[in-house]
From Swiss-Prot:
The keyword Disulfide bond does not apply. Gene3D superfamilies: MFS general substrate transporter like domains. Its main location: membrane. Residues 1-21, 77-83, 131-156, 200-218, 278-287, 337-356, 400-416 are cytoplasmic. CDD domains: MFS_MefA_like (cd06173). It comes from Shigella boydii serotype 18 (strain CDC 3083-94 / BS512). This is Enterobactin exporter EntS.
Length: 416
């Protein structure tokens, strides 16, 4: 493949067996988690007939994920990362078995579902942080953009396939099948992960875990480059919460039930296109400026989305947001890995991922509040243009990020 091609280079899967193992394990894991994501809300709704109870389970799991990301960041910088990944995956699978056994009971326990949701949310995020911290060692820092794009494609593809499989399983066999196959898939991921090389953390002095986590916070706040990247990531995630307005906007556009699906598919489709056409991103001389501009463009797309007179134009705006946000996210991921010291990778990746979780929750809450005071169209536009104003201010304030220059990575024969 020509080094100037816009298309994503897949050669990393051929030349790096360890990354290929992670790629396979991640895809199976995404599908397994998707089966779980369909089953839990359906089971709780069937048991309680309460959307509040369903929302509570999501909130509890999200809180456990946040704690797991914090703890996982400290563990990934302190212990052998392969062991942390395997321990987290195996322990998570045990929780899925618990959900399966609970579903088979004559009267399943709602409390057990909540507790196992906490268990799985914590251990799933624990492994995510360790895997992110280990990626530079697996592929080399010069290949991080390519690895990030392949990972994004894996997540998007798995996120499309798994709900469809989960829905079919619910219709034919019930929630126990979803939980059982999620557990089986999780344990299957251990097979490729066992082939990973040892991934020891860099040597560093022992300190109290809280002190270690605070050191990560201090580094994030003290570094205008890494801190700016994390801030942009949080704002971008807030913008993606616009999906909570889809049902109301669909009524405004008088969309049919089948047409509403296009709204939900638009952002993942745009993001997949962004990942597939990311071939030149790694060769950008000014990735910080490109990140800022693509983020601003994504905010503008959300601002225009609700103003479109026809739903098909709204779908185009969402797809544009997906593409631009994919570009920004890939640049964020690559710069975060390359500009963070090896000894801090676990904690900084944990904090970066955690702000994605909290940014989505904050964005959904703000849009819900705006929706109570404004029309859906006004809410969507206000969120997009409000974030655009903040983004313009950050473009002026984040001088180091805006001016950051890098030497494009050399392309080897295996990449061409």
């Amino acid at each position: 493949m020509n080094k100037q091609s816009w298309l994503l280079n897949l050669s990393l899967l051929k030349t790096h067996p360890a990354f290929r193992a992670v790629f396979l394990a991640r895809f199976i894991s995404i599908v397994s988690l998707g089966l779980l994501g369909v089953a839990v809300p359906v089971q709780i709704q069937m048991m309680t007939h309460s959307t509040w109870q369903v929302g509570l389970s999501v909130t509890l799991t999200g809180g456990a994920m946040f704690v797991g990301l914090m703890v996982g960041g400290v563990l990934a910088d302190r212990y052998e990362r392969k062991k942390v990944i395997l321990l987290a995956r195996g322990t998570c699978g045990i929780g899925f078995i618990g959900l399966c056994l609970n579903a088979l009971l004559p009267e399943p326990s709602l409390l057990a579902i909540y507790l196992l949701g906490l268990w799985d949310g914590f251990f799933a995020s624990l492994g995510v942080t360790a895997l992110l911290a280990a990626t530079p060692a697996l592929v080399g820092r010069e290949n991080l953009m390519q690895a990030g794009a392949l990972t994004m494609l894996t997540v998007r593809l798995g996120s499309v396939i798994s709900p469809m499989i989960g829905g079919l399983l619910l219709a034919t066999g019930g929630v126990a099948w979803n939980y059982g196959l999620a557990a089986a898939g999780t344990f299957i991921t251990l097979l490729p992960l066992l082939s990973l090389p040892a991934l020891p953390p860099p040597p560093q002095p022992r300190e109290h875990p809280l002190k270690s986590l605070l050191a990560g916070f201090r580094f994030l706040l003290a570094s205008p480059l890494v801190g700016g990247i994390a801030l942009l990531g949080g704002l971008l995630t807030m913008a993606s919460a616009v999906r909570v307005l889809y049902p109301a906007l669909a009524d405004n556009w008088q969309m049919s039930a089948a047409e509403i699906g296009f709204l939900y598919a638009a952002i993942p489709l745009g993001a997949a296109i962004g990942a597939l056409t990311s071939g030149k991103l790694a060769h950008s001389a000014r990735p910080g400026l490109l990140m800022l501009l693509s983020t601003l463009g994504s905010f503008l797309a959300i601002g225009l989305f609700g103003l479109m007179p026809m739903w098909i134009l709204g779908v185009v705006c969402l797809a544009l947001f997906g593409w631009l946000s994919a570009v920004s996210s890939l640049l964020q991921y690559t710069m975060l890995q390359t500009q963070t010291p090896e000894a801090m990778l676990g904690r900084i990746n944990g904090l970066w991922t955690a702000q994605n979780v909290t940014g989505d929750a904050i964005g959904a809450a703000l849009l819900g509040g705006l929706g109570a005071m404004m029309t859906p169209v006004a809410s969507a536009s206000a969120s997009g243009f409000g974030l655009l104003i903040i983004g313009v201010l950050l473009l002026l304030v984040l001088v180091e990020l805006r001016r950051f220059r890098q030497t494009p990575p050399q392309v080897t024969a295996s990449d061409s």
